[in-house]
Amino acid sequence: MTAAVPASGRTSRAHRLRGLAGVGLLATLAAMLATTVVAALARAAGVDFAVPAGGETIPIPGFAVVTGVFSVVGIVIAAALLLWSTRPAARWVWTAVALTAISLVAPLLCGGTAATVTALVGLHLVPAAVMIPALRWSLRAE
């Protein structure tokens, strides 16, 4: 009886994708928790998160949801880089830093108070500080 053995490159790639997904999901949960805690602390310190452009106040759970969604987008980008790039870790860092920088434009243009804008900028950087190194580490792991 013979067993089909997958090519080692395919097995290695599948193993690395599973590892990336696992690390990414754990990092997503950590980023969601960290962002929610920082948002709650900012709210407790008096930041109202009122955005005049939309006429709404951002609810604390909204930070967790948006962080989760965009963290999963980051995992998908990292997976694509793992599959199609010869240097996925380096490409991930460049891509993620560029996307983080672009994401800072919205808080700066939202028309909120200085405290709200500062808190929103910080709340963009918190999940980036969790996700970028975690996925970089996972992409570098052999």
Predicted regions and their residues:
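Transmembrane alpha-helical segments of multi-pass membrane transport proteins and ion-pumping complexes
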Residues: 31-43, 71-79, 108, 128-133
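Membrane interfacial helix motifs at helix-loop boundaries and amphipathic/re-entrant anchors
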Residues: 37-67, 105-122
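Short, Lys/Arg-rich, polar N-terminal cytosolic tail immediately upstream
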Residues: 1-18
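Internal alpha-helical transmembrane segments of multi-pass membrane proteins
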Residues: 20, 72, 79-100
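Membrane-water interface at the C-terminal end of transmembrane alpha helices
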Residues: 23-31, 126-142
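Hydrophobic alpha-helical segments of small multi-pass membrane proteins
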Residues: 93-104, 120-131
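Alpha-helical transmembrane segments of multi-pass integral membrane proteins
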Residues: 26-27, 66-70
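Alpha-helical transmembrane segments
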Residues: 25-35, 97-101
